[in-house]
Curated annotation (Swiss-Prot):
InterPro entries: DNA-bd_dom_put_sf, XPA/RAD14, XPA_C, XPA_CS, XPA_sf, Znf_XPA_CS. Zn(2+) binds at C99, C102, C120, C123. The gene is xpa. This is DNA repair protein complementing XP-A cells homolog. A zinc finger (unnamed) spans 99-123. It holds the Pfam family XPA_N. It comes from Xenopus laevis (African clawed frog).
Length: 267
């Protein structure tokens, strides 16, 4: 009669089974990771290099420059530089981004690719929070200069889009409104300072408009007066009243309209 296994031995066997399964899973994960790293390295090699193949480079051609020295002619193959398009390697688990809105991991998204903003496509709010605005609006509404947009680090990211008003015009530059607001606060310091600057500019703009308006009114009045004076000077005809006796043979008539007096004598 065989002795029954002790409970302690059975527990050790179960632990060995669980441990072996965990080890096998870890080995499999390491193997998959090694394969992915190998694929990433291979993707960085656009052309395979064959073993045992050697190339013999011909001596460069020498050209007399006529100035007392010789120059070497570059080969056409050396002058032509091909643009090698390299496919990005696979995204590893450690390369995942964490969404600022929902906290979930994601590989890439519209906002992360174009504006370096870690927000997944599911959480993107194109109408409000992640709205895009034009460069003109960014300069007028948030009082940013070209240097604030293009020179100040980090340079604001943008996308190009066809102008909806006229396709023949240049492409529009669209910026992320949240990043524009952040840059505006960096420039002006606070929202209150920005609003004060807006009020000052508005007052100056209104003063300039009023000044231009007053100048136009003044010119218009001058033009009207000049035209009336010319009309009166060229088209007025005297309408004299009754004749008045002044002395002996002298008489006069007075214009009813302008008061001009005409003196004359009668023989």
């Amino acid at each position: 009669m065989e002795p029954e296994p002790e409970p302690e031995q059975e527990a050790n066997k179960e632990e060995e089974k669980i441990l072996s399964a965990a080890v096998r899973a870890k080995i499999e994960r390491n193997r998959q990771r090694a394969l992915m790293l190998r694929q990433a390295r291979l993707a960085c090699r656009p052309y395979p290099t064959g073993e045992g193949i050697s190339t013999v480079k011909a001596p460069p051609k020498v050209i007399d420059s006529g100035g007392g020295f010789f120059i070497e002619e570059e080969e056409a193959e050396e002058q032509h530089v091909e643009n090698v398009v390299r496919q990005p390697g696979p995204v590893l688990e450690c390369d995942y981004l964490i969404c600022e809105e929902c906290g979930k991991d994601f590989m890439d998204s519209y906002l992360s690719n174009h504006f370096d903003l870690a927000v997944c496509d599911s959480c993107r709010d194109a109408e409000e929070k992640h709205k895009l605005i034009t460069r003109t609006e960014a300069k007028q509404e948030y009082l940013l200069k070209d240097c604030d947009i293009d020179k100040r680090e980090p340079v604001l990211k943008f996308i190009l889009k066809k102008n909806p008003h006229n396709t023949h015009w240049g492409d529009m530059k669209l910026y992320l409104k949240a990043q524009v607001i952040k840059r505006s606060l960096e420039v002006w310091g606070s929202e209150e300072a920005l609003e004060e600057a807006k009020e000052v500019r508005k007052d100056n703009r209104d003063k300039m408009k009023q000044k231009k308006f007053d100048k136009k009114v003044k010119e218009l009045r001058r033009t009207v007066r000049s035209s009336l004076w010319k009309k009166e000077a060229s088209g007025h005809q005297h309408e004299y009243g009754p004749e008045e006796h002044v002395e002996e043979d002298s008489y006069k008539k007075t214009c009813i309209t302008c008061g001009y007096e005409m003196n004359y004598e009668k023989m």
